[in-house]
């Protein structure tokens, strides 16, 4: 099983004061114990790279968590799957980053997507029964 983090879930890891920081940490630890990978679509990082301080903090987090977090670049196969996610949901390019999270999840038989935006992701995930969207509290 795979756990996919969207930008909000990565932001929760980044900021100790974030309301979902402990929740994301706990879910990653449970996943690690079960042998599940934690994956971040690299396109989601574009939503987080903002200014030198914040970008530096994000790079430090990714370096510190390099064994826990797998970055998934968009290759041609993933791009094709993302297009399929958008098409199946009747969505446009405004949902491109969210569609990447669902597509990365759909690459595995069973996956969980951690998100602060469950509405859009649930709509995109509807055609994929093995993908479960979990809202951060």
Where are these regions (language model features)?
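Active-site neighborhoods of divalent-metal-dependent phosphate/nucleic-acid chemistry enzymes
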Residues: 70-118
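Acidic, PIN/NYN-like endoribonuclease modules and their adjacent C-terminal/linker elements
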Residues: 2, 108-137
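Alpha-helix/helix-capping structural signal
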Residues: 8-9, 43, 77, 119
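Phosphate- and divalent-cation-binding pockets in alpha/beta enzyme and binding domains
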Residues: 47, 57, 81, 123-124
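Short, well-structured N-terminal submotif of metal-dependent ribonuclease cores
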Residues: 1-39, 50-64, 128
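Conserved beta-strand termini and adjacent loop/short-helix elements that scaffold enzyme active sites
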Residues: 41-43, 72-74, 116, 134-137
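A generic "structured core" feature
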Residues: 22-24, 37-40, 67, 90, ...
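Structural recognition of alpha->loop->beta junctions
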Residues: 61-69, 137
């Amino acid at each position: 099983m795979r756990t996919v983090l969207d930008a909000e879930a990565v932001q929760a890891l980044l900021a100790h004061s974030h309301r979902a920081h402990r929740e994301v940490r706990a879910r990653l630890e449970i996943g690690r114990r079960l042998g599940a990978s934690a994956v971040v679509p690299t396109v989601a990082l574009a939503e987080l790279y903002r200014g030198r301080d914040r970008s530096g903090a994000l790079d430090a987090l990714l370096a510190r968590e390099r064994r826990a977090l797998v970055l998934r670049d968009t290759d041609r196969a993933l791009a094709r799957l993302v297009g399929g996610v958008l098409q199946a949901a009747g969505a446009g390019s405004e949902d491109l980053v969210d569609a990447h999270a669902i597509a990365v999840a759909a690459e595995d038989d069973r996956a969980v997507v951690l998100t602060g935006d469950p509405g859009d992701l649930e709509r995109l995930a509807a055609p994929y029964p093995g993908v479960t969207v979990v809202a951060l509290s």
